[in-house]
Swiss-Prot record:
Phylogenetic lineage: Eukaryota, Metazoa, Chordata, Craniata, Vertebrata
Protein name (Swiss-Prot/TrEMBL): Phospholipase A2 inhibitor gamma subunit A
Primary subcellular site in the record, as a coarse category: secreted
Source organism per UniProt: Elaphe climacophora (Japanese rat snake)
Subunit structure: Heteromer composed of subunit A and subunit B.
Domain of life, per lineage: Eukaryota
The family this protein is said to belong to: Belongs to the CNF-like-inhibitor family.
Tissue: Expressed by the liver.
Coiled coil: none
Amino acid sequence: MKSLQIICLLFIFVARGSCRSCEICHNVGNDCGYDYVEECHSPEDQCGKVFLEISSAPLSIRSIHRNCFSSSLCKLEHFDVNTGQETYLRGRIHCCDEEKCEGRPFPGLPLSHPNGYVCPGVLGLFSEDSSESEAACKGDETKCINIVGYRKERFPGDIAYNIKGCVSSCPELRLSNRTHEERRNDLIKVECRDAVKITPSE
């Protein structure tokens, strides 16, 4: 069941998309098994390629997405969220002006140790409210991120998600404009704050 949730979660972050045509594909793994070209709709005005990875020791699953993206999403470029319990959600975004964008592969996870900061940690799917645990921040992770939203699909319907964890910096994410496109990824909460420093007990 956990593996199924991880695979589903990989697909909900990529919203569909100015008169531009881009290559479209969604696949688990590092390569697209199929693709087709589709005209984009405003505000998704750039072609892009996204690698997503959820690693939850010892399981690691990657997916690839080529699609139409908004310029605001393209500016994000990459993200790494430590949701606790040795689980990471990672993404690499590359946009271009051509139908088929080629991005750089994932770097390996850095070897880092807890730095004394903590954040609430959640990697939840199918619900905006999920039980949270404490995420021990590592390396240069000193910020806490909280993202809640849903992916609207014709089938199986709206997929809610809730993500909390440690990040090294606050991403430039904005709440979605719900006035466009029938199939979309809607952010309904984006919060980022300083992590809490744990004082060692004497």
